Amino acid sequence: MFSRAGVAGLSAWTLQPQWIQVRNMATLKDITRRLKSIKNIQKITKSMKMVAAAKYARAERELKPARIYGLGSLALYEKADIKVPEDKKKHLLIGVSSDRGLCGAIHSSIAKQMKSEVATLTAAGKEVMLVGIGDKIRGILYRTHSDQFLVAFKEVGRKPPTFGDASVIALELLNSGYEFDEGSVIFNRFRSVISYKTEEKPIFSLNTIASAESMSIYDDIDADVLQNYQEYNLANIIYYSLKESSTSEQSARMTAMDNASKNASEMIDKLTLTFNRTRQAVITKELIEIISGAAALD
């Protein structure tokens, strides 16, 4: 009496609500899984923000006395008006970063500044060598400037930098065998908890300082004294840049983790709303099926 096509169509129509229900249940499971994952990530970002806030408070306290040493050492170069002769070609670029990430554009801003300086100095006929303080800056620049790397330092940023760390870096540079004429230290100077600025400070070799016209008025300065002062000055400037970079990094990480936590909250709210709507749709479909079945029996 009934055709085969009619029976097939009836079967498809009868099974359709069940497939819809299974699909909605699978969607609910996916949403639940995503919610759980995002909530776990939010816990991690909140914890990292708290850790970064504690480290930032300590770094900011230690930055104030470190600035005195750094600015004092830089004042000599400014007041002495040390200038490098045109025939001097060797330039050293020191980039200060760290081994840790999740702190915004802290490391990429240093790399961008160093790439720009390398291009400018190379175009001017200078011989440029690079020094990377921190594994992040080495990882960014080594792919494109591996032939210009003099030395790279790791294990930076895991603990607060000390003057001993800066002294080790300065000694390694002095013993590297590369006799540079002048150089620059590129780092992020801390301005506020939400702001930092990439800056560049000069450094000079012993020969450049000794041959400066303004230094010739001090005839009684012993060569050993001037050498000790130059080495101490180099360590001071590196220490100052490490402290500035460390404070900037912790404040940037704290801000980044705060933004990540807020974004996670927004995603949780949206997924919760989607979950509730999907669950309501499943319940509505089940009620329709029950009512339709009851009406058919009547």
Curated annotation (Swiss-Prot):
N6-acetyllysine modified-residue sites: K39, K55, K115, K154, K197
Residues recorded as bearing N6-succinyllysine in the entry: K49, K115, K154, K270
Phosphoserine PTM sites in chain numbering: S146
Any GO MF annotation of the entry: proton-transporting ATP synthase activity, rotational mechanism
Any one Gene Ontology cellular component term annotated for this protein: mitochondrial inner membrane
Organelle targeting peptide span: 1-25
UniProt entry tagged with the keyword Phosphoprotein: yes
InterPro entries, sorted: ATP_synth_F1_ATPase_gsu, ATP_synth_F1_gsu, ATP_synth_F1_gsu_CS
Transmembrane residue ranges: none
Function: Subunit gamma, of the mitochondrial membrane ATP synthase complex (F(1)F(0) ATP synthase or Complex V) that produces ATP from ADP in the presence of a proton gradient across the membrane which is generated by electron transport complexes of the respiratory chain. ATP synthase complex consist of a soluble F(1) head domain - the catalytic core - and a membrane F(1) domain - the membrane proton channel. These two domains are linked by a central stalk rotating inside the F(1) region and a stationary peripheral stalk.
Name of the featured protein: ATP synthase F(1) complex subunit gamma, mitochondrial
Gene: ATP5F1C
